[in-house]
């Protein structure tokens, strides 16, 4: 979480610069200047050189504009910032210094693939033979074998992360449920998400009726002094038509979902909630046999969206949330 603060600071700096240029109508002309302004040099701050750091900023600028970080867009809102990925040199199972090079060689005897060999001071695991079954780690009486994984891969609950031939992280769109756990797990900030801040600014400048909606949890992102009321006031001063707390949608959907669940209970059927997009994605992609159990009640965001559209058919809707799975532009 502490490492996450550094990444969030960089992300906010990029968003601020992009938004400032978009408001001024200068983004197209000065987009390439952002990387140089944020990384002036001559000394690098975090990486090997200022040129790598600037390329990372350029890819973050693309994300801020709602584009893919690289040249190919797979449609996923979660994106790998390839220039930031460090190709973490981590072998899954590694013999540590705790190895006593004992006579029993429980690790070697436990391995069915001949991947472990005795060494002068400790045993060694041949990564080309290792099947990552974990038997050696379980057998070692000294707990000298560590199971190491890249933070991004370890955090993914659906095994959607792998690596290409260059060691760069790849997200499998067919498996990804867009929960965003990988974004916060990477110590190098090599995974980010698209935003639609430029589209929103352009819509406001064009005089469209842009309404902002926010998840209740986002109130805590700005400190104790910032409330929904003060946030609403600030958003209207920026040019938004109005501001809605999506907690209202939670109240609306809770009533409908409770009724739906009561009817299902009478019929002996099972139901699961539809409020969390990541959860619904997980069910549909990884447990399709349970897809019919997902509640047909819309999410709180959709409920408030329909309410606003009913009141103003010309409304353009923006939803802000602290959850990556909610990063969806509502047109």
Predicted segments, located by residue:
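Ferredoxin-type iron-sulfur electron-transfer modules and their immediate structural context
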Residues: 1-139, 143-153, 159
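Conserved beta-strand segments that form the floor/walls of ligand-binding pockets within enzyme
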Residues: 94, 213, 319
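Short beta-strand/turn micro-motifs composed of small residues
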Residues: 99, 214, 321
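Iron-sulfur-cluster electron-transfer modules
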Residues: 128, 142-143, 148-308
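Conserved small/polar residues in nucleotide/adenosyl-binding loops
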Residues: 319-326
């Amino acid at each position: 979480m502490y490492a996450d603060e550094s990444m969030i600071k960089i992300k906010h700096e990029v968003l601020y610069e992009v938004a400032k240029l978009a408001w001024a109508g200068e983004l197209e002309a000065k987009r390439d200047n952002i990387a140089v302004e944020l990384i002036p040099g001559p000394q690098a701050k975090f990486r090997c050189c200022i040129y790598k750091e600037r390329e990372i900023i350029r890819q973050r600028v693309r994300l801020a504009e709602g584009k893919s970080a690289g040249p190919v867009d797979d449609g996923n809102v979660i994106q790998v910032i390839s220039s930031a990925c460090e190709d973490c040199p981590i072998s899954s199972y590694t013999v540590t210094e705790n190895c006593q090079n004992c006579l029993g060689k429980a690790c070697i005897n436990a391995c069915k693939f001949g991947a472990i060999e005795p060494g002068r001071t400790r045993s060694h695991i041949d990564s080309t033979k290792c099947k990552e079954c974990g038997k050696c780690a379980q057998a070692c009486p000294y707990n000298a074998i560590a199971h190491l994984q890249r933070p991004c891969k370890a955090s993914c609950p659906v095994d959607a992360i792998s690596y290409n031939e260059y060691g760069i992280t790849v997200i499998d769109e067919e498996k990804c449920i867009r929960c965003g756990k990988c974004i916060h797990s990477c110590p190098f900030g090599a995974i980010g998400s698209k935003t639609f801040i430029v589209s929103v600014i352009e819509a406001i400048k064009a005089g469209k009726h842009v309404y902002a909606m926010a998840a209740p949890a986002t109130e805590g992102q700005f400190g104790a002094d910032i409330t929904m009321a003060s946030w609403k006031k600030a958003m209207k001063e920026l040019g938004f038509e109005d501001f809605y707390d999506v907690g209202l949608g939670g109240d609306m959907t809770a009533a409908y979902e409770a009724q739906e669940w009561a009817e299902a209970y009478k019929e002996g059927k099972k139901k699961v909630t539809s409020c969390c997009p990541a959860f619904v994605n997980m069910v549909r992609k990884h447990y399709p046999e349970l897809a019919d159990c997902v509640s047909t009640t819309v999410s709180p965001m959709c409920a408030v969206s329909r309410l606003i559209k009913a009141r103003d058919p010309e409304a353009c809707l923006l939803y802000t949330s602290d959850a990556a799975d909610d990063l969806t532009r509502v047109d």
